[in-house]
Swiss-Prot record:
GO terms under biological process: homoserine metabolic process; methionine biosynthetic process
Keyword Amino-acid biosynthesis (UniProt): yes
Pathway(s) where this gene product acts: Amino-acid biosynthesis; L-methionine biosynthesis via de novo pathway; O-acetyl-L-homoserine from L-homoserine: step 1/1
Protein name in the entry: Homoserine O-acetyltransferase
Entry's localization field: Cytoplasm
Gene name of this polypeptide: metXA
Enzymatic reactions: L-homoserine + acetyl-CoA = O-acetyl-L-homoserine + CoA
Keywords: Acyltransferase, Amino-acid biosynthesis, Cytoplasm, Methionine biosynthesis, Transferase
Cross-referenced Pfam families: Abhydrolase_1 (PF00561)
Chain residues that bind substrate: R215, D352
Main localization of the protein described in the UniProt heading: cytoplasm
Amino acid sequence: MSEQQTASLGEFTFECGESIPDLELAYETYGEFTGDNAVLVCHALTGSAHVAGGRRRSDTSGQAHAWWDDIVGPGKAVDTTDYYVICANIPGSCYGSSGPPSTNPETGEPWGTTFPAVTVGDWTRAQRRLLDHLGVPHLHAVVGGSVGGMNVLDWAKRHPDHVNRVAVVAAAARLDPQCLALDAIARRAITTDPNWNGGDYYGEDPPVEGLALARQIGHVMYLSKSSMQDKFGRRSSGIDAGRDSFEMDPAAGFFPYREVESYLDYQGEKFARRFDANSYLYLTRAMDNYDLASGYESDRDALAAFDGEALLISFTGDWHFTVEQSEAVADAFRESGTDTAHHVVDSDHGHDAFLVEPDRVGPPLDDFLVDGVAGKAVSDTTPDDDDGDEFAPVHTSLFSD
């Protein structure tokens, strides 16, 4: 199992104009570097550098379980016997990299909300600096899902000559207003928790109730209506089941505590034990702010300098980052002259599909890394298909021919 390491990368100026004296990035590497086989994996919103290798020791910073262990590893889609894989915890997070809960060396106290505002562009710049530290001048590929996919797009835009292939999974060029609104409500849940205290809660009781509510909102975004119906329906966990989880008004005792409520309460409470509330504020704002076309006339212009190959993977049940949004990014790549494929997976799992359906994500990703858009398991959208379907069929099994 790869061990988490920390790189001290010196003074770093964020896009907001503020600086910190020493940017620290927690990272893990897998496989051996041969000079042309480096693959950077960009994690999603609340992920960590621990992308592969099973379960960590309980005393190790970050998520206990590797978050993409079914995709990254020996003999898997991102095969660590062939590739040198790097995954770094992004600035602003709380899994070992510089962020609100880390220590300000000038005060000896946590930064809290005095930590500079972070952007997706800052993540890319920090990753580039880490790669320089590791002696990796060029990448075979950058791969990422969700906001990690936005991070991938930023690589194609910001460092087009530094990477051969980009794989953008369940992402978009920017968030739509509905997702912006839900993220704003989630942040409000945190900042209205009395324990948030303007972000100065370290050493005191943290705003766990607000953070748990924020995560519950996120989980609703990650599931599809179909998956929620299949998973929960309207089933009850029992009238009294919720009393131990939160305070209830007397009239609530007449009504059932439903399984969907129980699920959200469990997920919220679990998340609040492992993540930092200020980091959640910082990272959701970075995601909300990202716009591929920023500084350019269009998405196509933003990608014009990229001369590699691009793969988009999207999921029909994902309303957080829709198939149509991925198709728009694919079109921008195509219009800029990039060899591009958009592989659509028919799935009811919502946004979570990129994490929970490795048998659908693995084959196209594997073949793309090896053969580019000509890969055997890589399908592409064909709006002019004779059957009238908007999108082409996709492979449905890891073992399909």
